Regions:
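Terminal amphipathic helices with adjacent charged low-complexity linkers/tails
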Residues: 7-70, 124-135, 284
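Short glycine-/aliphatic-rich beta-strand segments at the starts of folded cytosolic domains
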Residues: 71-91
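Mobile "lid/hinge" segments at catalytic clefts and subdomain interfaces of large enzymes
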Residues: 1-36, 206-265
């Protein structure tokens, strides 16, 4: 109801709830939502019958044990674990989905929960079940950089320009050979065009697809964004920087990783003290 009343129907690119705060302001959006909520509560019946409520009972499984692998997370319920799995680029193939289904189908109360960043959690696992799920998902992201996000890309999207999944795969393949420590390179966000499906503006490093004119003719390129943040209260929408040709971006990230590794640092600490070096590296790859 709030979007119907206040959403942008003139500009298709801004026909999203996230743009309502821009047009109404933070307080205005809260006020508009409360106004519509009040109307719905007066006009609709929200009374629930006890028979409609989901009856649940505590899940009982064997005593838990500690795990060293970061992808296994202890749940708040004693003895239960969640296993994080992110297919590279969020591309969960039908065969892999079937494999996961057949693996967890006999596991009592085990479920899959999806994340907004193309990953998933297999929850309510016992210790032994968590180990089985972990072994079955070794093809996914193994560190922060490999959890990077890419939109579906121009090979499928009719609007897109850049092939985001191909770029991400090339970057991960190149970076893996360097064996950087976890955290040396941040999670990146890649969109194939200005539609922002890869949410490049909120990425620590983001790339947005386009075309760059070169002496050899037009080539696929991605404009770089840096310093974005999606955390509540710390939100930053980054500005667009220069464009780097797509086939040079894996080398750019490898060189960046080597610079950071040389100082035995993680990206977030390094960039705060070495932003000028980061800009110099961008200039090198956009010259």
């Amino acid at each position: 109801n709030t979007f119907t009343a206040y959403g942008n129907y003139e500009n298709r690119g801004k026909a999203r709830t996230r743009f309502m705060q821009e047009s109404l302001g933070k307080d205005g959006l809260i006020s508009a939502f409360r106004e519509k909520l009040s109307q719905v509560m007066k006009s609709e019946s929200l009374t629930l019958q006890p028979s409609e409520l989901l009856q649940t009972a505590p899940i009982q499984k064997e005593t838990g044990i500690p795990f060293a692998d970061k992808r296994i997370i202890s749940q708040k319920q004693a003895g239960l674990y969640a296993v994080f799995y992110q297919p590279i680029g969020g591309n969960l193939t039908p065969d892999k989905a079937a494999c996961l289904y057949h693996l967890i189908e006999p596991m009592k109360d085990v479920e899959i929960r999806l994340t907004p960043d193309e990953g998933l959690y297999v929850i309510n696992c016992s210790a032994s079940e968590a180990e089985k799920v972990l072994k079955a998902t070794t093809d996914g992201a193994q560190n922060l950089f490999e959890t990077s996000v890419a939109c579906i890309g121009a090979s499928i999207c009719q609007v897109g320009i850049g092939n985001s999944p191909a770029l991400l795969s090339a970057c991960i393949e190149k970076v893996r050979k360097e064996n950087f420590a976890d955290g040396v390179l941040p999670k990146i966000h890649i969109s194939g065009c200005p539609s922002s499906c890869g949410t490049h503006q909120i990425g620590t490093i983001g790339f947005r697809g386009g075309i760059r004119q070169t002496p050899d003719g037009p080539k696929p390129a991605f404009a770089i964004f840096e310093g974005g943040c999606p955390l509540q209260g710390q939100e930053v929408i980054s500005d667009m920087g220069k464009s780097i040709e797509a086939d040079k971006i894996p080398d750019f990230l490898v060189e960046l990783g080597k610079m950071i590794s040389a100082e035995a640092a993680a990206y977030d600490k390094w960039i705060a003290a070495n932003h000028d070096k980061f800009i110099e590296l961008i200039e090198k790859y956009t010259a």
